[in-house]
């Protein structure tokens, strides 16, 4: 059996998952990152995408996250998401509302903030294409 570690996915609204995991794939801003037991200590920012968790009991859980930070230690990983939802609970309306909110914020934005919001909208659009069937 593979080594396991403690994983927690937390959003401002609630604790979404606290489990013993064998592998977690995180959509880090530098690219997808796979976390396993005894991982080197790392902190990374998280972009909108899908977090895939393989639990120690063999289940696979998928969550859509909308940005955040991951704190990775050899004994565990905590992902603090700006917002997150289980993929099974994500629907087109939720995603379209998030995109509309970002577009509204884009109207008054300039320079670097405008670029960040445009990138966020692109990431949300891609996320929708990945997890929501047409």
UniProtKB/Swiss-Prot annotation:
Q: Name one GO cellular component term.
A: proton-transporting ATP synthase complex
Tell me where it resides.
Cell inner membrane
The UniProt entry, under Pfam families, shows:
ATP-synt_DE_N
State the membrane topology: Peripheral membrane protein
Main localization, broad class = membrane
Q: Name one GO molecular function term.
A: proton-transporting ATP synthase activity, rotational mechanism
User: Which keywords does the record carry?
Assistant: ATP synthesis, Cell inner membrane, Cell membrane, CF(1), Hydrogen ion transport, Ion transport, Membrane, Transport
Q: How does it assemble?
A: F-type ATPases have 2 components, CF(1) - the catalytic core - and CF(0) - the membrane proton channel. CF(1) has five subunits: alpha(3), beta(3), gamma(1), delta(1), epsilon(1). CF(0) has three main subunits: a, b and c.
In terms of HAMAP family, this protein maps to:
ATP_synth_epsil_bac
What NCBIfam families does the entry give?
A: ATP_synt_epsi (TIGR01216), PRK00571.2-4 (NF001851)
Q: What does this protein do?
A: Produces ATP from ADP in the presence of a proton gradient across the membrane.
Give the similarity note: Belongs to the ATPase epsilon chain family.
Q: What is this protein called?
A: ATP synthase epsilon chain
- Taxonomic classification: Bacteria, Pseudomonadati, Pseudomonadota, Alphaproteobacteria, Hyphomicrobiales
Gene, per the UniProt record? atpC
């Amino acid at each position: 059996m593979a080594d396991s570690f403690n994983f927690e996915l937390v959003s401002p609204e609630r604790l979404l998952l606290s489990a013993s995991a064998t592998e977690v794939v995180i959509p880090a801003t530098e690219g997808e990152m796979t976390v396993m037991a005894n991982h080197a200590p790392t902190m990374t920012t998280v972009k909108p995408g899908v977090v895939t968790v393989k639990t120690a009991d063999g289940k696979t859980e998928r969550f859509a996250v909308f940005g955040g930070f991951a704190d990775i230690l050899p004994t565990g990983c905590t992902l603090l998401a700006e917002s997150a939802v289980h993929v099974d609970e994500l629907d087109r309306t939720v995603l379209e509302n998030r995109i509309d909110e970002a577009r509204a914020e884009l109207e008054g934005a300039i320079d670097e903030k405008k670029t960040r919001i445009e990138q966020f909208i692109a990431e949300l659009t891609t996320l929708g294409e990945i997890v929501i069937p047409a």
